[in-house]
Amino acid sequence: MKFSEMPYKRIDMEEVEKEYKSIIERTKNAKSGEEQFEIHREYYKFTADVQTSMELAMIRHDIDTTDEFYEKESDFYDEVGPIISQYENEYGKVLYDSPYRDYLESKIGKVTFKNIEIANKAFDEKIIPLMQEENALSSRYSKLIATAKIPFEGEVYNLSLMKKFQTSPDRELRRKAWKAVSDYFLSVTDEIDEIYDKMVKNRTEQARQLGYENYVELGYYRMNRNCYDKEMVENFRKQVKEYFVPFANKLHE
């Protein structure tokens, strides 16, 4: 089946919440690891269906940000996404604290529980309104970029199509292309600045409400970095500067 042929239906949040609550409650009351594992398999199927609907809507919105139907669907998921995250975290906590943890680890792996631990560090019900605002700001920026119309050489292009001119072997054509793209960004500078300012304040507030000094640590958790941290990345950058850059310079010489 082609992507364009995949059927889409908006999720029913009332039914979604009902199913999450049922899965969470049954997991809490399970009498064995085997029973919890079977419920977990149901959870995988259920969340896969929910995620498929969300991804279909978001991708189709990205393909054509002027499509009013999928714009409304995107706005809907911007709102309900953090609520779904709340149920995901609640279920994850039940699984994480399971008395049958050893059995579950043998079935779904230890990494799953490491990811649950990270997810718990990146979420709390109290930041749902901030997460909804963050989603809306991100969608607003994406639309601003996707709907760019740039007059160039007698035609009108979007940012993606301008890249072929920006990388042209013709130096003068490249210069004109970069000038045209720069002019577009200058025309929307105020809006981009507003989005950026609100996003920084939003994410900083999320981090502080979760007990972090700034968004950096929270950002690593949000990216689900389960095998390295900020200090390790800093060390990697340091090694690149000390060893790889001099080596690359010698190659160029």
Label each PLM-derived region with a short phrase.
Residues 1-253:
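A well-structured
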